[in-house]
């Protein structure tokens, strides 16, 4: 039996961007609450939030073609893009508040302005992109988005991508200045430094082995100190499971009925990073292409300017891979041990329904360096093999569950909150847009888990996030105000110049 510790108001499991965001929100709204964080690794932001384990895209649906779909009548549905864009503005507003309050330091350490572009080839794809641009540019959220199918204009926008290119089919791109590159690792670390100053106890190298409900309605966690091997029991009124790929196992251990019937499918990612600074300097944008037929949404190829440790870099990917691990630092048994009697049929159904995904992953795993270079050359025709290295990114666990629309064993490509009916425990599952919408998602957790308190907190939340509870698309005056204030605070001036014009 472990050594029993005191009772806390809140326990956060996992020191990633989600726990960092929730902890920071709670400390602004309920500074008197006692909060403790448990993290298995030795530092914050070391798994999916780490800057090398994600693409660093501020997902605002400016360039990601999988967030806009062509309907049967040929029109473009931008509903999902609108939703994600508004959610990213929530993050920008909160970060701006934290900078203005002195909680976050120099914003360029974690966010930089960077044009976002969509790039396609082939007659049908160009027609789709043109229609998408017409639909989006008419919306206030996407004002300022440009379209061109002129190779000369493209050579101005992306010289590296056009150099040496044989243009033997239609080619086009959209470009919008208001994109961002976000270093979620740096942001996470800064937020945890702040929480430490606010007397939040952060226990690194502490692994949560079990979660159970006690007779008095608390949640008791069995926590092992990985340095000493000792086990402690910690209790809290509210528990947030923000452990990335580790969340599903912990949700299952909690025993809440809402966690039944959910499975996870792990997908790993590889990127290619350019080691020639002269090549890196020739590109300044995040350029997203179109997923190949049969490929999953998270496989959309993109060529990204990144800023890591204040150094400009150039990455291309992702190439998908498969590992049964649910975390980069996880166990090879993760997938197997996540299969339970209550989710086995759901997982099997997903396997049958997603043979194309399975085949795609097998093909990706077997790619040689030269085959990866061929894919890169679709973006950078002059790419030389010795100037690009392969880096292994993080693991993502896609949610599998039964849905009304998709039926049994449907793969959910997105971010999902699962919470107990009484709001005493919540878990975050899934992947993209993930970190970009962290503030919106954590407010959703708070609305579901602290509904009465949210009424008291509403005025303070509105102070931090002026658009809270409103649609920016429907309130253009507020949108302009938010664009101007976030650009000013986050050093993104010029960032919204075209929208504000």
Curated annotation (Swiss-Prot):
- Co-factor(s): FAD
Q: What Enzyme Commission number(s) appear in the record?
A: 1.1.5.4
List the catalysed reactions. (S)-malate + a quinone = a quinol + oxaloacetate
Instruction: Output the GO biological process annotations, alphabetical, semicolon-separated.
Output: tricarboxylic acid cycle
Task: Cite the annotated pathway.
Answer: Carbohydrate metabolism; tricarboxylic acid cycle; oxaloacetate from (S)-malate (quinone route): step 1/1
UniProt keyword annotation of Isomerase present: no
**Has UniProt tagged this entry with the keyword GTP-binding?**
no
> Keywords of this protein's UniProt record, alphabetized?
FAD, Flavoprotein, Oxidoreductase, Tricarboxylic acid cycle
Q: In the record, what terms sit under GO molecular function? A: 2-hydroxyglutarate dehydrogenase activity; L-malate dehydrogenase (quinone) activity
Report the SUPFAM superfamilies cross-referenced here: FAD/NAD(P)-binding domain
> Which NCBIfam families does this one have?
mal_quin_oxido, PRK05257.1-1, PRK05257.1-3, PRK05257.1-4, PRK05257.2-1, PRK05257.2-4, PRK05257.2-5, PRK05257.3-1
**Homology family:** Belongs to the MQO family.
**In its UniProt entry, what is this protein called?**
Probable malate:quinone oxidoreductase
The source organism is Geobacillus kaustophilus (strain HTA426)
> Which gene does this sequence derive from?
mqo
């Amino acid at each position: 039996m472990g050594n029993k510790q005191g009772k806390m108001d809140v326990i956060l499991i996992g020191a990633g961007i989600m726990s960092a965001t929730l902890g920071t929100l709670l400390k602004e709204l309920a500074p008197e609450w006692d909060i403790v964080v448990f993290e298995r690794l030795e530092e914050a932001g070391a798994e999916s939030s780490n800057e090398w384990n994600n693409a660093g895209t501020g997902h605002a649906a400016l360039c990601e073609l999988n967030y806009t779909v062509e309907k049967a009548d040929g029109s473009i549905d931008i509903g999902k893009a609108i939703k994600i864009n508004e959610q990213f503005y929530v993050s920008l507003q909160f970060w701006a508040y934290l900078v203005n309050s002195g909680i976050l330091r120099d914003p360029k350490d974690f966010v930089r302005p960077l044009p976002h572009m969509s790039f396609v080839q082939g007659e049908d794809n160009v027609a789709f992109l043109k229609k998408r641009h017409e639909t989006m540019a008419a919306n206030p959220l996407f004002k300022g988005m440009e379209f061109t199918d002129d190779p000369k204009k493209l050579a101005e926008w992306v010289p590296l991508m056009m150099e040496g290119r044989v243009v033997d089919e239609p080619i086009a791109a959209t470009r919008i200045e208001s994109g961002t590159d976000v270093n979620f690792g740096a942001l996470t670390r800064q937020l945890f430094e702040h929480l430490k100053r606010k007397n939040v106890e952060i226990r690194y190298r502490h692994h949560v082995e079990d979660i159970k409900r006690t007779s008095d309605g608390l949640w008791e966690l069995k926590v092992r100190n990985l340095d000493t091997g000792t086990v402690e029991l910690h209790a809290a009124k509210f528990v947030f499971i923000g452990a990335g790929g580790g969340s599903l196992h912990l949700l299952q251990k909690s025993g809440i009925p809402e966690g039944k019937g959910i499975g996870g499918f792990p997908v790993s990612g590889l990127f290619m990073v350019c080691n020639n600074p002269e090549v890196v300097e020739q590109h300044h944008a995040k350029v997203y292409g179109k997923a190949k037929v049969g490929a999953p949404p998270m496989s959309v190829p993109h060529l990204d300017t990144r800023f890591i440790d204040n150094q400009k870099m150039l990455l291309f990917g992702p190439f998908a891979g498969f590992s049964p691990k649910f975390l980069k630092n996880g166990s090879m048994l993760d997938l197997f041990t996540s299969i339970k009697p209550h989710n086995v049929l759901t997982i099997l159904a997903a396997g049958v329904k997603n043979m194309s995904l399975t085949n795609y992953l097998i093909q990706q795993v077997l790619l040689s360096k030269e085959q990866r270079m061929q894919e890169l050359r679709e973006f950078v025709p002059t790419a030389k093999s010795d100037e690009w290295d392969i880096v292994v990114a993080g693991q993502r666990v896609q949610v599998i569950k039964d849905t009304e629309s998709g039926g049994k064993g449907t793969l959910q490509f997105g971010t999902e909150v699962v919470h107990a009916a009484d709001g005493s425990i919540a878990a975050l599952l899934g992947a993209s847009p993930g970190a970009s919408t962290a503030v919106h998602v954590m407010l959703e957790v708070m609305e579901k888990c602290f509904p009465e308190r949210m009424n008291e907190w509403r005025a303070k939340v509105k102070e931090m996030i002026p658009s809270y509870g409103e649609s920016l698309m429907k309130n253009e005056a507020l949108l302009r105000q938010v664009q101007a204030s976030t650009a000013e605070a986050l050093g993104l001036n010029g960032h919204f110049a075209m929208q504000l014009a």
